[in-house]
Swiss-Prot record:
It holds the Pfam family Ndr. This is Protein NDRG3. Residues 347-359 have a biased composition (Polar residues). PANTHER family: N-MYC DOWNSTREAM REGULATED (PTHR11034). InterPro entries: AB_hydrolase_fold, NDRG.
Length: 375
């Protein structure tokens, strides 16, 4: 436990050691584009150049954030350079959420979540991108999932952090409407990102994001994006039934890594999403001692998981591996040797003592459970 605490404190520090708390929010060597789509203008930021026929890493942020506050701590993390040297990165900002965005005109109809997903194909076409590996958080994870369901040929893999695949129930909708009259939108967004324990214990991090949401994000535009997210439809994904080959079944066909911190308010939703996805190509990563923004609080662990995820897809095979990846490789070596996907076994990896525990019965090769990893 002491080791986990040391890692957590070390990785939070770079976010907070600047006087304004935004040091790792900065972009480096990027190009910005405003791209017109049938559903309006979208702002994108490109890091690096496309590498041959490799997919581009495309990110989509959550409500109350933009690509800088959601992803730059992660992509500026030192170990991520081993990945970004092999891939171009395309950060997408939802309409009106980018830094210094002007307010929309009165009466502007903000795109629905489905329409936000349909803004992505014109972006890829404009930038001559053939396919993506998506990384989405919260609302961004939902948008990328919808995009992958509608355009599976354009998506090679997805990393979905804090995803909620369900529509907002009418009781939740009514509660959010009532709370909107009595609660500041900043507090609503903070409660979306962080659980009560984190809100009370990690005061520096919470203050950093409170100021960012209140001062750096256009409040009128944020209200519109929040309304769009609250009005989302159910993704209507279904877990395939063993032995049944039904092309009409709606599910994510690409390799998928689900990520959630064990103290995140999104745990229940992510577990629900996991239960609906094909276990053959899905991995669920539960990050210990972690709250609602694992890419910010523990970028090292997430980088290692992402590196291993890319290796499983056949990319960057020479990348270095730390204990998390080595323990997972050891526990799946027999299945890989027999031609089985490393993502088709259920394994729990304990970083604190380097041990791993198989969750399958010894006499049955489990090919139909999602791999669940704790780190």
């Amino acid at each position: 436990m002491d080791e986990l605490q040391d890692v957590q404190l070390t990785e939070i520090k770079p976010l907070l050691n600047d006087k304004n708390g935004t040091r790792n929010f900065q972009d480096f060597d990027c190009q910005e584009h405003d791209i017109e789509t049938p559903h309006g203008m979208v702002h994108v930021t490109i890091r690096g150049l496309p590498k041959g026929n490799r997919p581009v890493i495309l990110t989509y942020h959550d409500i109350g954030l933009n690509h800088k506050s959601c992803f730059n701590t992660f992509f500026n993390f030192e170990d991520m350079q081993e990945i970004t040297q092999h891939f171009a990165v395309c950060h997408v900002d939802a309409p009106g959420q980018q830094e210094a965005a002007p307010s929309f005109p009165t009466g502007y109809q903000y795109p629905t979540m489905d329409e936000l997903a349909e803004m992505l194909p014109p972006v890829l076409t404009h930038l001559s991108m053939k396919s993506i590996i998506g990384i989405g958080v919260g609302a961004g994870a939902y948008i990328l999932s919808r995009f992958a369901l509608n355009h599976p040929e354009l998506v090679e893999g997805l990393v979905l952090i804090n995803i909620d695949p369900c529509a907002k129930g009418w009781i939740d909708w009514a509660a959010s409407k009532l709370s909107g009259f009595t609660t500041n939108i900043v507090d609503i967004i903070l409660a979306h990102h962080f659980g009560q324990e984190e809100l009370q214990a990690n005061l520096d991090l919470i203050q950093t994001y409170r100021l960012h949401i209140a001062q750096d994000i256009n409040q009128e535009n944020l209200q519109l994006f929040l309304g769009s997210y609250n009005g989302r439809r159910d993704l209507e994904i279904e877990r395939p039934i063993l032995g049944q080959n039904d092309n009409r079944l709606k599910t994510l066909k690409c390799s998928t890594l689900l990520v959630v911190g064990d103290n995140s308010p999104a745990v229940e939703a992510v577990v629900e999403c996991n239960s609906r996805l094909d276990p053959i190509n899905t991995t669920l990563l539960k990050m210990a001692d972690c709250g609602g923004l694992p890419q910010v609080v523990q970028p090292g662990k997430l980088t290692e998981a992402f590196k291993y995820f890319l290796q499983g897809m056949g990319y960057i095979p020479s990348a270095s591996m730390t204990r998390l990846a080595r323990s997972r490789t050891h526990s799946t070596s027999s299945s890989i040797g027999s031609g089985e996907s490393p993502f088709s076994r259920s394994v729990t990896s304990n970083q604190s003592d380097g041990t791993q525990e198989s969750c399958e019965s010894p006499d049955v090769l489990d090919r139909h459970q999602t791999m669940e990893v704790s780190c």
